[in-house]
Amino acid sequence: MKERSTELVEGFRHSVPYINAHRGKTFVIMLGGEAIAHENFTNIINDIGLLHSLGIRLVVVYGARPQIEQNLADHHYEPVYHKHTRVTDNKTLELVKQSAGLLQLDITARLSMNLNNTPLQGANINVVSGNFIIAQPLGVDDGVDYCHSGKIRRIDEHAINRQLDNGAIVLIGPVAVSVTGESFNLAFEDVATQLAIKLQAEKLIGFCSTQGVQDKDGKILSEVFLNQAPELIKELEVKGDYYSGTVCFLRSAIKACRRGVRRSHLLSYQADGSLLQELFSRDGIGTQIVMESAEQIRRANINDIGGILELIRPLEQQGILVRRSREQLEREIDKFIIIERDNLTIACAALYPYPEEKIGEMACLAVNPKYRSSLRGEVLLNRIAEHAKQLGLEKLFVLTTRSIHWFQERGFEPAELSMLPIQKQVLYNYQRRSKILMLNLEPQPGFT
């Protein structure tokens, strides 16, 4: 008898909303030369093929920096840089074209073949390259001529979209031609960024040697806001990581995010399956750079009742929360705030004000177990406290049987039953014997 894999079933169920959400969207994928040279590149290619089979419009932009460096070394030619940008003279240009051309052929071959020995065996993938980008020279800076190092003059987004509409993967490298027929060496990060902006891509995806951006303790930051990214870049540059994949990608993500690309993702090219885990799971595996959080804290409405019930039922069964019926929730839904992540309610809390006594009760604080290691409970507490102050309340109380220390660590102090509003005193459950804790609220401007 075959064994059932519940993990596979659950994983597939959780991925379905993302499959539907991503279908028909445009993703720009940045593949640096380091990623292409790594042994895991075959798996990345297979996963790119899988994305294509799911109806995602893909533009793959590749770089060749380490391959160019090796080619220069093999020809005993010393690379020249000015302000961290390669000076591409005639000899260097020939070697750049050689390296980039070989990679284009290799990537095209890998994407075009039938992907034997993979779940996509027999799939037909068309890969298209062309003169979609017109370049121009960087020119002269501080007396240094960049020669054939260039930048983008314009992008033919209509031609690219035609190919994407026809079901092709568009492959673009770091060499482009000018209106005069000259070839120029471009920074592939700039190419990917400008393409994502011009194509109004849903996502810009990059790869580096680590699984995203790390904090000072070495932990992966699952989310970085746009206003945080510049400081992270400075910290990495101080360490001498000017050319690291992380720094280059962060620079690109900032530009893309400011120009309308909703999310940028940074993943490890060393970890098998990182691309799929990032795109088809709620929490991902790398770092995403966003204008605003993927999570939303807001007032609950009648459509949120199902999600709240699903969140609080386990806690009610354990006796941690007082049981609430659907009918009660419907009557009191305006008292609740929730934290929502990708249409899933992951945390909730309620405020029951007693205006005459200038006091309020914080109740039904619940956080999904997968998200309890973060500060979401504290975020809800702060939001409830702010709302209470806006209502002119001076105190906030809770009744709790299990979270006494958590509230005390946040300023709550033991209180007597007689300190509660009369209505609450009458309803106090002597069988539960909940502890009463109270917090003095700082006065909100406008209230005395």
Curated annotation (Swiss-Prot):
Keyword Amino-acid biosynthesis attributed: yes
Start and end residues of each N-acetyltransferase domain: 295-433
GO biological process entries: L-arginine biosynthetic process
Signal sequence, renumbered to the chain: none
Catalysed reactions, semicolon-separated: L-glutamate + acetyl-CoA = N-acetyl-L-glutamate + CoA + H(+)
UniProt KW keywords: Acyltransferase, Amino-acid biosynthesis, Arginine biosynthesis, Cytoplasm, Transferase
Pathway: Amino-acid biosynthesis; L-arginine biosynthesis; N(2)-acetyl-L-ornithine from L-glutamate: step 1/4
Keyword Transferase appears in the UniProt entry: yes
GO cellular component, one term: cytoplasm
Superkingdom per UniProt: Bacteria
Location relative to the cell: Cytoplasm
GO MF term list: L-glutamate N-acetyltransferase activity
CDD domains hit by this protein: AAK_NAGS-ABP, NAT_SF
Family per similarity comment: Belongs to the acetyltransferase family. ArgA subfamily.
Oligomeric form and interacting partners: Homohexamer.
Stated name of the protein: Amino-acid acetyltransferase
Organism: Photorhabdus laumondii subsp. laumondii (strain DSM 15139 / CIP 105565 / TT01) (Photorhabdus luminescens subsp. laumondii)
Name of the gene encoding the protein in the UniProt record: argA
